[in-house]
């Protein structure tokens, strides 16, 4: 397999994985954007909307809408950040329970998928993705 074919497979797999996350979110009765916002907040309590939009490639207005809805449902609270414009997002107790209820089964699926391929293959995926991402980032920023 040549480099072009390898890259096409990498891109196809990334897109398919995103599609599967969309499918799971829909099955759980929420949007992909809501699920990814919950996921981001689970990984980094106190994350800002800006960090979610940049790190998770979600539209700014969409993240704002999701956060406002989660706030309306009393699942999150906002606290002042370093500057007054940016608010840090935290789960409330009921929000943490909601996120665990929604994300817990997803985490179990992810874990079972990794177990199915074995620890060596899982580590190879992690190592390969980290190396490819770093090399791709260098190429994208070369000369800029």
Where are the regions a protein language model picked out?
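C-terminal regulatory/oligomerization modules of transcriptional regulators
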Residues: 1, 119-144
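N-terminal helix-turn-helix DNA-binding core of bacterial DNA-binding proteins
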Residues: 19-62
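Residue cluster at the C-terminal edge of the helix-turn-helix DNA-binding motif
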Residues: 28, 55, 71-75, 116, ...
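DNA-binding alpha-helical recognition surfaces that contact promoter or target DNA
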Residues: 65
């Amino acid at each position: 397999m040549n480099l072009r074919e390898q890259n096409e497979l990498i891109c196809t797999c990334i897109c398919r994985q995103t599609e599967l996350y969309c499918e799971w979110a829909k099955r759980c009765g929420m949007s992909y954007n809501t699920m990814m916002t919950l996921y981001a907040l689970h990984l980094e309590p106190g994350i800002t909307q800006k960090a979610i939009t940049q790190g998770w490639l979600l539209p700014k207005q969409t993240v704002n809408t999701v956060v406002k809805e989660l706030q309306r449902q009393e699942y999150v609270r906002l606290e002042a950040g370093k500057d007054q414009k940016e608010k840090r997002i935290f789960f409330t107790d009921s929000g943490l329970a909601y996120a665990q209820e929604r994300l817990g089964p997803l985490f179990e699926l992810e874990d079972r998928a990794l177990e199915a391929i074995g620890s060596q293959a899982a580590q190879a995926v992690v190592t390969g993705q980290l190396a490819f991402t770093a090399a791709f980032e260098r190429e994208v920023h070369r000369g800029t």
